[in-house]
Amino acid sequence: MGSKGLKGVMVCLLILGLVLEHVQVEGKSCCRSTLGRNCYNLCRVRGAQKLCANACRCKLTSGLKCPSSFPKLALVSNSDEPDTIDYCNLGCRASMCDYMVNAAADDEEMKLYVEHCSDACVNFCNGDVGLTSLTA
């Protein structure tokens, strides 16, 4: 793996670490609808939890279950939104793997980057983040 590829992997790991920290915080907010969930997620990029929950009509909770009137729990695989993992994979691949493809020197290196990056995204979105998937 060339030095450009190693730098790309390191950038990917750093960003995934930052996103993972952010995801753990969002697991404690419940929204009435997918629109409310999307509003909350967008707001949380820069806004505080309480401010975003109020603005998007969501509710903060300390448990893993949402009240029946607030069924949309963020990024929990057994919530009412099983597609969150698919959206996570798609977003991760679009943002991280595209960068790595552009850093590849040749087709063989590009295939290797895409394979490792896709595996890392799947592991990240399923909650199994580990360095072994990138260094294998």
Curated annotation (Swiss-Prot):
Keywords recorded for this protein, A-Z: Disulfide bond, Plant defense, Secreted, Signal, Toxin
Residue ranges the record assigns to the propeptide: 73-136
GO molecular function, one term: toxin activity
Covalent S-S links between cysteines: C30-C66, C31-C58, C39-C56, C43-C52
InterPro entries membership: Thionin, Thionin-like_sf
Gene3D superfamilies for this protein: Thionin-like
Biological-process GO terms, alphabetical: defense response
Origin: domain of life: Eukaryota
Segment forming the signal sequence: 1-27
Pfam families: Thionin (PF00321)
Location within or outside the cell: Secreted
Main location (coarse class): secreted
GO cellular component, one term: extracellular region
Family as reported in the entry's similarity comment: Belongs to the plant thionin (TC 1.C.44) family. 4 C-C subfamily.
Quaternary state and interactors: Homodimer.
Function text: Thionins are small plant proteins which are toxic to animal cells. They seem to exert their toxic effect at the level of the cell membrane. Their precise function is not known.
The protein's name in its UniProt record: Beta-hordothionin
Protein species of origin: Hordeum vulgare (Barley)
